[in-house]
Amino acid sequence: MDDDIAALVVDNGSGMCKAGFAGDDAPRAVFPSIVGRPRHQGVMVGMGQKDSYVGDEAQSKRGILTLKYPIEHGIVTNWDDMEKIWHHTFYNELRIAPEEHPVLLTEAPLNPKANREKMTQIMFETFNSPAMYVAIQAVLSLYASGRTTGIVMDSGDGVTHTVPIYEGYALPHAILRLDLAGRDLTDYLMKILTERGYSFTTTAEREIVRDIKEKLCYVALDFEQEMGTAASSSSLEKSYELPDGQVITIGNERFRCPEALFQPSFLGMESCGIHETTYNSIMKCDVDIRKDLYANTVLSGGTTMYPGIADRMQKEITALAPSTMKIKIIAPPERKYSVWIGGSILASLSTFQQMWISKQEYDESGPSIVHRKCF
């Protein structure tokens, strides 16, 4: 497919926006879903200061900006900022005219219906898209792994969900959603670093903590044992250099932070951990298909990138499942982008071309068309 008519695939995550062309094997643009506004008054005339910055530019100027994420827990909370992010995606990152390309957007399962209606409306009315489609993120991850059956545990920055899919059919009654994901872990790391005497409070400092989390955290196979190791020796300590040259040391925080995925009580939440949520999701499915789901548990999303997470999932689910059950956790190396890759695959299938919602259909039916045409 040529770029001139290629469909666009935009995976709008709560934390990162991944965008590119259908048929490509990786997104061309990956940038933080952030809009930043200056905290201070501009004094130098002719500097061309803007009243808002998006993505990487906001990230690089974060010291003087207040950063806001327009998507929280997978749901758009600020549509004006969201429009800025899409505008930035089309015109600055991909450098295309949105009115010339069909666009595939992604969404978390169990999102409010109004969310996808508004997405549809903005695409057709603000950007004049010729056609669009909204796909469920976890389903795309399964496409990317080359399977038609499996349970996807997709955990990003804003939301974690488990979606069982059998022979290409998602089983909506068994989809479970957990509003605990990367951003909550970043906040938790900010909190436990404060106990060590390092203070991180502003929206800009939160980004530093996110970087610490991504570079140094890992999941312990046995939490209690690891805590013992950390207490008795300094073998687990790592140092991190802050932007001003100060060096901080972190020890048990490295695995205490992602442990909250398995023990949400760390965050004061009463929900089940990701292992139990996955198990509960499987148990909501028909008894005949559970075996196939246990053997095809696919991890996807940035929050599944911690070293050790697949082994820990294997251990925890083995403990919950029947003792003879074969359990396989699939953690593809590109899982950070597997939603986008799945979107790229889907949008370039010849059989998918009749699934697009066209501008004409939208004009006839209005935004509610999205519920009829997109699963």
UniProtKB/Swiss-Prot annotation:
It catalyses: ATP + H2O = ADP + phosphate + H(+). It is an enzyme of class 3 (hydrolase). InterPro entries: Actin (IPR004000), Actin/actin-like_CS (IPR020902), Actin_CS (IPR004001), ATPase_NBD (IPR043129). Its EC number is 3.6.4.-. It holds the Pfam family Actin. This is Actin, cytoplasmic 1. The keyword Cytoplasm applies. Keywords: Acetylation, ATP-binding, Cytoplasm, Cytoskeleton, Hydrolase, Methylation, Nucleotide-binding, Nucleus, Oxidation. In vertebrates 3 main groups of actin isoforms, alpha, beta and gamma have been identified. The alpha actins are found in muscle tissues and are a major constituent of the contractile apparatus. The beta and gamma actins coexist in most cell types as components of the cytoskeleton and as mediators of internal cell motility. Actin is a highly conserved protein that polymerizes to produce filaments that form cross-linked networks in the cytoplasm of cells. Actin exists in both monomeric (G-actin) and polymeric (F-actin) forms, both forms playing key functions, such as cell motility and contraction. In addition to their role in the cytoplasmic cytoskeleton, G- and F-actin also localize in the nucleus, and regulate gene transcription and motility and repair of damaged DNA. The modification Tele-methylhistidine is found at residue 73. One of its GO terms (cellular component) is focal adhesion. The modification N-acetylmethionine is found at residue 1. It comes from Oryzias latipes (Japanese rice fish). The keyword Cytoplasm applies. GO terms for molecular function: ATP binding; hydrolase activity. It comes from the Eukaryota.
